[in-house]
Curated annotation (Swiss-Prot):
InterPro entries: UPF0178 (IPR003791). Pfam families: DUF188. Coiled coil: none annotated. It comes from the Bacteria. This is UPF0178 protein BH1374. Belongs to the UPF0178 family.
Length: 157
């Protein structure tokens, strides 16, 4: 979204390594003329349209998260399924949404982090834990609806 002096008001960052809605992000963002930066490790090859860019980082465990955390600003938007990254970005004033269309905010992030921590403890103790449920058409539709709502609110529409 651009204002009168053509200065970018906000940007969208995408934790792109395992993001199932890259095409949808580009389509919606392009309709609002919003810059999108897909951040991915060298282990994942990807191409994007002419209005987006890809930043490739090392394949280290948290390299994508660190890049996004170091470059995101207040009012920027991030698409990620990573609860830890979401928590960090919320403290910076960013809007964070999952690829399933779940909005992360301060009221739910602590419980999500606690659930993740408990699952990690259970796995280390040898217990079986559930993985994420399958990504469904409804998840994709919910994401598009929520993402469009975020961008239209930012654009003042």
């Amino acid at each position: 979204m651009k204002n009168e002096d053509s200065t970018q008001i906000f940007e969208v960052f995408v934790d792109a390594d395992s993001c199932p809605v890259k095409d949808e992000i580009e389509l919606v963002a392009e309709s609002y003329k919003v810059k999108v930066t897909f951040v991915s490790s060298y282990a994942h090859n990807m191409t994007v349209g002419p209005t987006s860019k890809v930043v490739m980082v090392d394949a280290e465990r948290e390299a994508v998260d660190l890049y996004i955390a170091n470059h995101i600003k207040k009012k920027d938007v991030c698409v990620t399924h990573d609860y830890g990254l979401a928590s960090l970005l919320l403290t910076k004033g960013a809007t964070v949404i999952s690829p399933r269309g779940q909005m992360f905010d301060h009221t739910i992030i602590d419980s999500l982090l606690a659930q993740r921590h408990q699952s990690q403890k259970d796995r280390r103790a040898g217990k079986k834990t559930k993985g994420p449920r399958a990504y469904l058409k409804g998840d994709r539709e919910r994401f598009i609806q929520q993402f469009e709502k975020i961008l239209s609110n930012r654009a003042g529409i």
